């Protein structure tokens, strides 16, 4: 095996291991430590509390959001569930959106990602977007939906490649708090 392939193989195995841990019930409630993060923006979604977190430059902001009408991890197209895992923003969409349903902008996620495909998950069209009206908990068809004023605030930070971590329960803690526990 050529030397250049080793780092990519190690990264791929590490990513699969992390994604596999999300199948373990104890790993589903995880804690993100925000201290010392690089300058990259990271978003996280706590489905149980209907919260969207935006972490950047060592600071965390949170917003009300809504996720799928049916609880649990998305498995198949049309199950009305929001997937759980690590996804990335693929692109921003502003053209031909039904304002009442999607607001004025949508950020397309890479669901299903390679790990989802290995697990046999189907479906597509999982976005982070807003609505032309106020949101209520657990009302989406699987997307992560924020209020219009909130998507206007976080949208500029949701660039292509931004990771979006979605889990049943997500805790945001400083490194100091995490070490104390």
Where do the protein language model's features map onto the residues?
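N-terminal secretory signal peptides that target proteins for export/translocation
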Residues: 1-8
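Bacterial N-terminal signal peptides
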Residues: 12-22
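Sec/Tat signal peptide C-region and signal peptidase I cleavage site
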Residues: 23-29
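Gly/Thr-rich phosphate-binding beta-strand-loop-beta motif of the actin/hexokinase/Hsp70
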Residues: 52
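Short acidic-glycine loop/turn motifs at beta-strand connectors
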Residues: 55-59
């Amino acid at each position: 095996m050529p030397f250049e392939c080793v780092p990519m193989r190690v990264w791929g195995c590490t990513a699969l291991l992390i994604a596999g841990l999300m199948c373990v019930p104890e790993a589903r409630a995880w804690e993100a430590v925000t201290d010392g993060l690089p300058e990259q923006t990271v978003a996280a979604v706590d489905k149980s509390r209907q919260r969207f977190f935006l972490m950047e430059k060592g600071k965390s902001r949170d917003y009300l959001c809504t996720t799928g009408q049916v609880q649990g991890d998305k498995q198949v197209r049309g199950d009305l569930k929001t997937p759980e895992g690590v996804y990335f923003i693929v692109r921003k969409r502003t053209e031909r959106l039904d304002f009442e349903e999607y607001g004025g902008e949508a950020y397309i996620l890479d669901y299903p990602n390679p790990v989802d495909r290995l697990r046999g998950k189907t479906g597509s069209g999982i976005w982070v977007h807003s609505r032309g009206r106020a949101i209520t908990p657990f009302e989406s068809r699987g997307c992560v939906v924020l209020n219009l004023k909130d998507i206007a605030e976080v949208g500029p930070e949701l660039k292509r490649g931004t990771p979006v971590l979605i889990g049943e329960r997500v805790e945001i803690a400083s490194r100091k708090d995490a070490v104390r526990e």
